[in-house]
Amino acid sequence: MTETSLSSQCFPMSVLNNTIAEPLIFLLMGIPGLKATQYWISIPFCLLYVVAVSGNSMILFVVLCERSLHKPMYYFLSMLSATDLSLSLCTLSTTLGVFWFEAREINLNACIAQMFFLHGFTFMESGVLLAMAFDRFVAICYPLRYTTILTNARIAKIGMSMLIRNVAVMLPVMLFVKRLSFCSSMVLSHSYCYHVDLIQLSCTDNRINSILGLFALLSTTGFDCPCILLSYILIIRSVLSIASSEERRKAFNTCTSHISAVSIFYLPLISLSLVHRYGHSAPPFVHIIMANVFLLIPPVLNPIIYSVKIKQIQKAIIKVLIQKHSKSNHQLFLIRDKAIYE
């Protein structure tokens, strides 16, 4: 069956709305117009997934194992890595399944679950970046009170509040998606479930879904972005009041990693929104490739940025790798000696 026939296939309402006995089945298109080359396109995507998963896992492992990194800044960094890791994994199975194995079918419940985690972790990343901006604000503007303001208990509360916020804004969106009826095309144009993509297939009024989706966006990234901007205005004002140019440079350098992380999250998001709004003349595969790449840019680049920019992370990674290598060699020597004496 061709992509055109799939997208035009009609399904009776009695069958489509029988979600309890037999959940609705949607078909993931992958990259429209590039079906013949999807296998080769998947290779760089797979490499990006490997880099994202291994890089963020390394950051989490290093922060967990190295006691010198048990500080507020690195706790927030581990939150960012955990979010990036989760964001990568929640689309990995369907994306590579579509590209490699033609596994295009996904039922409505699985689709809703994937959307919940996909959009939830995206909003979570925005919240973590805001928390990291607050960390930099306190470190530069109130250095003497840094450890008393950002205690372990307060950091845990910040992380929990971001999690609760995301669940609170995403749960109504998903519940109203569950109430939709679908009566025409069952083909999703991405390689994963995307909220806007799904509600456009509905044959019932989806205005409430659109409003809830917009509210979720504005109450998370729409709130976080201005707050991050405000924090850096206050940081710049504080840094410029420092008399020594060397101290000013050091203060700005402590923010470069976070500014880079904010840029690689918000700039692709803004670019993707502009392309969707104004790039109607662009081929459909351009939109889909951009959407897939956007999901992988922050998880791939964030570990690299923090590993390169922050010397403490570099030293901790090298230390952990050396210890692991030494432990492996020691075990090999023990095995060899045991074999000799036996």
Swiss-Prot record:
Q: Which GO terms describe its molecular function?
A: G protein-coupled receptor activity; olfactory receptor activity
Q: Which residues lie on this side of the membrane: Extracellular?
A: 1-39, 90-113, 175-210, 273-287
Recorded protein name is Olfactory receptor 51F2
Q: Which SUPFAM superfamilies match?
A: Family A G protein-coupled receptor-like
Q: Which domain of life is it from?
A: Eukaryota
What cellular component terms from Gene Ontology apply here? plasma membrane
Instruction: Give me the glycosylation sites of this protein.
Output: N17
What PANTHER family does the entry give?
Answer: OLFACTORY RECEPTOR 51F2, OLFACTORY RECEPTOR 56B1-RELATED
Q: Does the keyword Cell membrane apply?
A: yes
Between which residues do disulfide bridges form?
Answer: C111-C203
- Bilayer topology term: Multi-pass membrane protein
The cellular location(s) given in this protein's UniProt record come to: Cell membrane
Function summary:
Odorant receptor.
Lineage of the organism = Eukaryota, Metazoa, Chordata, Craniata, Vertebrata
Keywords (A to Z) from UniProt: Cell membrane, Disulfide bond, G-protein coupled receptor, Glycoprotein, Membrane, Olfaction, Receptor, Sensory transduction, Transducer, Transmembrane, Transmembrane helix
Which parts pass through the membrane? 40-60, 69-89, 114-134, 154-174, 211-231, 252-272, 288-308
Q: Which residues lie on this side of the membrane: Cytoplasmic?
A: 61-68, 135-153, 232-251, 309-342
Keyword Glycoprotein recorded: yes
The entry's family comment says: Belongs to the G-protein coupled receptor 1 family.
